Amino acid sequence: PPSRYVKFLTDYYKDYIDYYNYNGWGTISAVDCNQMEGLAEAVRSVILSNQDSLKNVDTADLQQYGKGSSNFKGYAYDMLQFIEKLCGGMAPDDFTQQLKKTVVYTGYTHDPTSSLYRIDGDNYSGMGMYIPNSFTTPKYLLWNNYFKSSIAWYHASGWAETESIWGN
């Protein structure tokens, strides 16, 4: 990020992380929203180029944010780790470069004292995303329908074109 933001981000990050190290767990990211369209295109390109592998990605193997809460379990997975798994272990360079332009600052609680949940720093890119699935429980059916009907990312990132693969 531009140098004028670094001190602000560093100070804010420190206060936020210090608080959540003692009150649960936390992640924080600064995103250049002007880059989101480029990120959607990069994700779309990877998803559509690797759609035959979509069913092979086991979300149980991915870093999941909020998994300690039944309200949020299954809703947000680390984007970079998902793309790496989808591509057989290595994310394409153009995707990685776009992610770096989009997510300009990240942080997480390294050792929260009051939570059993830990962020895996090796699999934390600062950007999570919902991964639609074929689960038929009411919770997932509701969220898949909401994702399809109300969130622009569904169409922008290529999920709409792959529904016949992951859908139910």
Task: Report the location of each language-model feature.
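Terminal, contiguous helix-loop blocks that mediate binding/assembly
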Residues: P1-N168
